[in-house]
Amino acid sequence: MMEGVRRAVAKFLRGGGVYEKAVDAFVKDLQRELIKADVNVKLVLNVTRRIKERALKEEPPPGVTRRDWMIKIVYEELVKLFGGDQEPQVDPPKTPWIVLLVGVQGSGKTTTAGKLAYYYVRRGYKVGLVSSDTHRPGAYEQLKRLAEEAGAMFYGEREGDPAEIARRGLEDLLSRGAEIVIVDTAGRHGHGEEARLLDEMKAIASKVRPDEVALVIDASIGQKAMGLAERFHKSTPIGSIIVTKMDGTARGGGALTAAAVTGARIKFIGTGETLGELEPFAPRRFVARILGMGDLESLLERIKSLEEAGELDRAAEDVLKGRITMRTIYRQLRAMRKLGPLGKVLQMLPGASMLASIDEGALKLGEEKMKRWMAIIESMTYEELDRPEIIDKRRMRRIAIGSGTSVDDVRELLVYYKNLKTMMKKLKRDKRLLRRLGMEL
């Protein structure tokens, strides 16, 4: 959905011709992308009708084009669609804080439990994980391993009554000083199984008395998330929703909008497989990334969490100010594994709508390519590091021999450098536009 909407935005902003016809074409493109993302058709028609009406009636302020104002309208209406101005309260209002994770089998509860633990450990909390799932083979071992990776305490039993296991786990972890306790529960398949799941969930809730019940939903179920959330809510009031696997499905938009319609608060979204790829869901920031306006706040949060934060702060400042050299790229590469794929990082920058014109393959750096590029940069002279434009064919051959790579590898790195420079020039223009629109993000 992100890529499709971003392409539509870029096409609209670059296009010419009659404004009214351009609006019609953009609205149709937007409808197509939202429906492909499994957003409810009625919701799609309502939001695009409001966008079109406002785009044709409203007059932009001096200095702002009608097309730029149109994107501001799209931004505001999509924010409403995805839940409005809600900002999740991620830090618990008190400690200890007990979180009960619930959901159907396959939704990613256990992985999410590990991600939540990692998220709060990084924020300075002492976290404990409880495995009460005695039904799924390997659930105990999986959560224990995740607890170790996240730096959290763990309690679990392979057999027994799940509600009693949860109670004993809570007592044990609190006695060890846990400030946040996350209880992982079993899931079920099928309607009849779901009824038993809800009964078990109520039994566990009565034993641990959670401060928050978080429903974990797989993004791939799309708009079915609405019915699922409502059924769980009738059994035990749902305090928050976590939508997982947003990176692996085109139906994530449907799941998010469906959950938002229920009135439940979407607190986190899972954006990848690693422990660090869980982020608070803020509709304004999410929509900004969809439209290519960026999400600098999320980017800076990731940067601050890195062990190499000091080094990356300099790299981020260089990128945002357009001062890009091979030294900047080298610092990016060194911390890339913790930041996540470069494509995701660049989506957080204003101007990401222009990424549609850049070869996506050049942005998805694998481990081997990262190693090759770092070796190439290490083989450059100081002058080449600061002025990559001087690197000609003769220098390419020398660098390739010195780094144990090929001339094609060196050329590929230089193409990436030029693409990044080009994108940052467009970023400056977009930042000025956002300020005029009063949409600093």
UniProtKB/Swiss-Prot annotation:
Major enzyme class: hydrolase
Residues given in the record as GTP binding sites: 103-110, 184-188, 244-247
InterPro entries: AAA+_ATPase (IPR003593), P-loop_NTPase (IPR027417), Signal_recog_part_SRP54_M_sf (IPR036891), Signal_recog_particl_SRP54_hlx (IPR013822), Signal_recog_particle_SRP54_M (IPR004125), SRP54 (IPR022941), SRP54_GTPase_dom (IPR000897), SRP54_N_sf (IPR042101)
Reactions catalysed: GTP + H2O = GDP + phosphate + H(+)
Record bears the keyword GTP-binding: yes
The enzyme's E.C. designation: 3.6.5.4
CDD domains: SRP54_G
Gene3D superfamilies: P-loop containing nucleotide triphosphate hydrolases, Signal recognition particle SRP54, nucleotide-binding domain, Signal recognition particle, SRP54 subunit, M-domain
An annotated GO cellular component: signal recognition particle
Cystine pairs: none
Keywords: Cytoplasm, GTP-binding, Hydrolase, Nucleotide-binding, Ribonucleoprotein, RNA-binding, Signal recognition particle
Molecular function, one GO term: 7S RNA binding
SMART domains according to UniProt: AAA (SM00382), SRP54 (SM00962), SRP54_N (SM00963)
GO BP: SRP-dependent cotranslational protein targeting to membrane
Locations listed in the record: Cytoplasm
Annotated domain remarks: Composed of three domains: the N-terminal N domain, which is responsible for interactions with the ribosome, the central G domain, which binds GTP, and the C-terminal M domain, which binds the RNA and the signal sequence of the RNC.
Subunit organization: Part of the signal recognition particle protein translocation system, which is composed of SRP and FtsY. Archaeal SRP consists of a 7S RNA molecule of 300 nucleotides and two protein subunits: SRP54 and SRP19.
Family listed: Belongs to the GTP-binding SRP family. SRP54 subfamily.
Function as written in the Swiss-Prot or TrEMBL entry: Involved in targeting and insertion of nascent membrane proteins into the cytoplasmic membrane. Binds to the hydrophobic signal sequence of the ribosome-nascent chain (RNC) as it emerges from the ribosomes. The SRP-RNC complex is then targeted to the cytoplasmic membrane where it interacts with the SRP receptor FtsY.
PANTHER family: SIGNAL RECOGNITION PARTICLE 54K PROTEIN SRP54, SIGNAL RECOGNITION PARTICLE SUBUNIT SRP54
Protein name: Signal recognition particle 54 kDa protein
Organism: Aeropyrum pernix (strain ATCC 700893 / DSM 11879 / JCM 9820 / NBRC 100138 / K1)
